[in-house]
Amino acid sequence: MANPKAKMSKSRRDKRRAQFNARTKAATTVICPNCGEPTLPHRACRHCGQYRGRAVVTKSANS
């Protein structure tokens, strides 16, 4: 059976495990209070451009 040549540090171990968790867990979404579309938490809404009641991203007229 294979044995490790050197001790793996906690940070290196956790970095490896983080990749598995990032791929298996679904992204958390919240409902935008302004337009009602699902969006990522703590980020501006992709549909209306608002974050915490303020317009932070201006939407162009043709989109």
Swiss-Prot record:
Keywords: Ribonucleoprotein, Ribosomal protein. The keyword Ribosomal protein applies. The keyword Ribonucleoprotein applies. It comes from the Bacteria. SUPFAM superfamilies: Zn-binding ribosomal proteins (SSF57829). Residues 1-22 are annotated as: Disordered. GO terms for cellular component: large ribosomal subunit. One of its GO terms (molecular function) is structural constituent of ribosome. Residues 7-18 have a biased composition (Basic residues). Belongs to the bacterial ribosomal protein bL32 family. This is Large ribosomal subunit protein bL32. It comes from Chlorobium luteolum (strain DSM 273 / BCRC 81028 / 2530). The lineage of its organism: Bacteria, Pseudomonadati, Chlorobiota, Chlorobiia, Chlorobiales.
